[in-house]
């Protein structure tokens, strides 16, 4: 049994709403996003005049669990977030659950790695310029520079902006599988 997340918005309508509503009432999915549009009844279009169409419901969708439907109210998400944030929220929840269930420590570490990166993207950390400047320097073949309030990393090839995840751990912008930790001892 796998966890299922259904993403919704105010523009989710009709059949997509029925899918969301039914899975929610059967407790088979977690609905994440915005309340849906509220169109449960199928309609037929009737031409009244050449420039006027009337849509009339001809049936009613009734959920066997709730004994009702979402007409006019929409499907209320289990987790309400703006539609633009629904994927990030579902992704983070999936990673958290996978990490919690993982019995293999390497697999758990992998899920935690991704989750830490996603959280850092969502809530960027600010590290003061004075601290950042202390990290600038030569580390063997690796060069860390401080430019316009930002740290950059370069070995050979392109230069990467360093994105703070913690005050001492940084991700390389554009490289999700590489991070740098500055080990500070005795204030250095």
Listing of model-derived features with the role each one plays in the protein:
Residues 1-129:
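C-terminal "post-core" interaction segments
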